A protein has these predicted regions:
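Active-site-adjacent helix/loop patches that line small-molecule binding or acyl-intermediate pockets
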Residues: 85
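Membrane-interface interhelical connector segments
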Residues: 32-71
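Extended, low-polarity transmembrane helix blocks
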Residues: 1-27, 74-78, 89-158
Length: 158
């Protein structure tokens, strides 16, 4: 059984899952829900108001961000939450599908890497036009997502 595991793929699955599980599910969904259910026990930075203050405050540092992005927060934040959860859901599907095994096609892992690239690109766009410091790590993660896509495609011989 252990000889059939594709050890070159498992770290990629673990990293993508851990990154998006923490940034999408734990930080956003659990933080916002905890802020609704028990506002006195929730960390204020992870509640809806906390995220709004942080994100809109970052966007408001630039005139472009203030004019174009800040008014859309209440509409865009739920979309961001869903987008940030998509890569880790696709990784779960990849693991359930057994894509960590050798000689196995990895479509769900590929979809997870593409969704990671898309989500990170959207986030980097908003942070870059706002001049936010968060854009630096996002640009690095865009690079990681692109390398992951190339690695998966190369590993499958495509």
């Amino acid at each position: 059984m252990l000889k059939k595991v594709a050890y070159q793929i498992v770290p990629l699955q673990i990293f993508l899952f851990a990154f998006w599980f923490k940034n999408g599910f734990i930080d956003k969904i659990m933080g916002v829900l905890l802020g609704i259910v028990t506002p006195e026990a929730a960390y204020s930075g992870d509640t809806w108001a906390g995220w709004k203050g942080y994100i809109v405050g970052t966007w408001d540092k630039s005139q472009v961000g203030h004019a174009l992005l800040s008014p859309t927060f209440d509409f865009m934040f739920p979309i961001l939450i869903l987008l940030q959860c998509l890569p880790f859901v696709l990784i779960l599907r990849s693991v359930i599908n057994g894509e960590f095994m050798s000689n196995k096609e990895r479509p769900w892992l590929f979809y997870a890497a593409v969704s990671s690239l898309f989500v990170t690109s959207c986030m980097a766009f908003t942070q870059t036009i706002s001049g936010a410091s968060d854009s630096q790590y996002l640009w690095q993660f865009i690079g990681f997502s692109m390398v992951a896509i190339m690695y998966i495609r190369n590993e499958q011989g495509k």
